[in-house]
Amino acid sequence: MKRVVHAACPHDCPDACGVLITIEDGRATKIQGDPEHPVTRGFLCAKVAKYLDRVCSPERVLYPMRRVSPKGSTASAGEGARATQSWERISWDEALDEIAHRLRGIVAEYGSESILPYSYGGTLGALNGASMDRRFFHRLGASQLERSICSTAGEEGLKSVIGIKLGTEPEQFAHSRYIIAWGSNIHGNNVHLWPFIEEARRKGAKLVVIDPYRTRTAKCADWYLPIHPGTDAALALGLMHVIIKENLFDADYVSRHTVGFEDLRARAEKYPPEQIADWTGISSDDIRKLAREYATQRPSVIRVNYGIQRSERGGMSMRAVTMLPCLIGSWKDIGGGLQLSLSGSFGLNKEALEMPELMLKALGRPARIVNMVQLGSVLNSLTAPPIHALFVYNSNPAAVCPNHNEVVRGLMRPDLFTVVHEQFFTDTTDYADIVLPATTFFEHKDLQAAYGHYYLQVSNQAMDPVGECRSNVEMFRALAERMCFEDECFLETVDSMIDRALESLNPRLKGITRDRLEREHRVRLNFAAATPKGAAESQSITASLKRCPDTNPDSSAAGAAPFLPFAQGNFPTPSGKAEFYSETLKRQGLDPVVAFTPPHESRHGSGSKAAGFPLELLARKPDNHLNSSFANLPSVRAMEPWLGDLEMHPTDAEARGVRDGDRIRAFNSRGEITLQARVDGAVPPGVVAARLDWARFSPGGGNINVLTSEKLTDLGNAATFYSVCVEVELFRA
């Protein structure tokens, strides 16, 4: 029997695609995009288009497995060898009994905070991302994980100005006249925004790309501006210098809807284009040209992504960029504003899903918080108490964590009990004691929000789990039973949890129920209920519609009038306005306006060259992987021919006697790796770049994170993957 199931892609991507899965005789035989989804519109990215290779892979973990060889002994073995030589198959009952026994013993001897959950964005489904797992660890009294490895610096920088993760909806990009992709490889990892940009360009829009790496998007741009890594705040301040000095800002919008303009004016005065040119590598003429075009060619919009916040001053960089649309008033325009993340709009009832009050039952207080970026130090140095059990799911820390050598040293500890819930044997399972088989999104039901559009979806289960795989929800439910947790929340069904997630005070969820989502497959958030329009805002939208005569607010693609979140201010900040000056930052001992300070590890920093590491490293994510996901699939790896390469500028290569194709050694004080030199024009002088891969596929068994640092960002305690300096030389065996 053949049937088609509506689902949604849960991977860590802004697009959250609507998906159609064809099932025949209980097996998935086809995956395709849902043509009725207003944003993703029926096509899939190259990696998810090959998702059957993932679901049906012969390398799936199908049964609970227990280690029978020393930790790390399989790090360079093949998949078949790994399964037969390192593991023995056990039943779920055996696995759960052993895990529960070990956890109870650790709690009794060291206390519950010696147990650490470790998860991130392996799925962004509301339930399998953060529900039963959080309940379990809260009830256990385990240490809390500060999940900050990816995006928190940018989010905190954004919110310090506008108060919420909200912005320009993707459909409106089609009506922009000037589009800046700032640290955003749209063509590579936000592909469903690209058609809207192409539509705008067909109508005459200009696409500008600001990025230290010549990405796919940069190659398609009308104007590409390579920038020195970590200098984005300087460029934004230079643009504001020109905009203010030449009176190109929207004085009325600034007066009515912002605070701290005079402080910003005084600060921007100190950043003339000539000084900015020295820091950024962008000429003063180009800085002036960019400022003038951005401020005058309206509607203008910035698609800024998380690349700019993965440096030591990443939070302030995002804060500076977020000020730009507030300064020129582009929030008033359809096709204007800025987009980083739209996830703050959904407002699901996370407290009902996660139940943090369970910590009080276990500890009588909230548990301590441990930062995920610093896992190496946490496993090797943390005391009071040390970590004695690590439970990994939705993540692959042995591949994605910075300071890889320290992470592996910690994972190798014989006294560390490690459980990994996974779909495949990964770098992290090489150090696990127990591996549990996990479902893909084909095999469980979930509720799916997005951070790149405003549509909420139910992702339906399409097929039975393969082998003995279990979802995060079902696995933690079973483990709670083994731990004798009698709280009723561990018996709650998936449908009930979806219902409770939708029972929110957020007015944008008004009228959105599970029944409606299952019937309609996707529902746009209810902005009419959330932001009733006064006369002034209605006039603003009407005026913007007149500037975009091809916009039909009642079209099926939009489904409602365009959403202009800050056309009339309404910023959910302490002041109720966009904050050029932040009292909150001041109370935290931080600069209340914005400034540029060079990252310590950078060409302008205070010691990288003196330490003998003059090259700035970009530890990039492959276009066709999602962080470390998909890296083990041959059909997807075939689309990434540059894995294992270090891209260099010809000037830097020549100075070191390196030619294209040579085997080289990249190193700093934290470690070294061997790669193959690729001498091309993808990076400017002084910059090198390499793509993240699994350590087991990398020469020498260590990936690019051997070189990265545990140092945290200025805001949000995030990772500084792009504040790294190295030296390169020819490899000598």
Segments from the language model and where they lie:
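Short beta-alpha connecting loops at secondary-structure transitions
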Residues: C220-I227, T439, Y454-V466
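Long, contiguous, secondary-structure-rich segments that constitute the structural scaffold
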Residues: N472-E518, A557, S628, L633-E647, ...
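Short, low-complexity intrinsically disordered segments enriched in A/P/G/S/L with frequent Arg
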Residues: S73, A81-R82, A535, R547-P549, ...
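N-terminal export/assembly segments and adjacent metallocofactor-ligating motifs
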Residues: M1-E246, K270, S283, Y393, ...
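N-terminal leader/propeptide and maturation segments of large enzyme subunits in energy/redox metabolism
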Residues: R67-P70, Q85-R89, E94, H241, ...
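Active-site phosphate/pyrophosphate-binding segments
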Residues: L239, V259-L375
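Extended redox/cofactor-interaction regions of prokaryotic respiratory oxidoreductases
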Residues: A130-E198, K203-V209, A233-L237, T322-Y431, ...
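Flexible, glycine/charged-enriched surface loops at secondary-structure junctions
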Residues: Y110-S114, F249-V254, V301, K332-Q339, ...
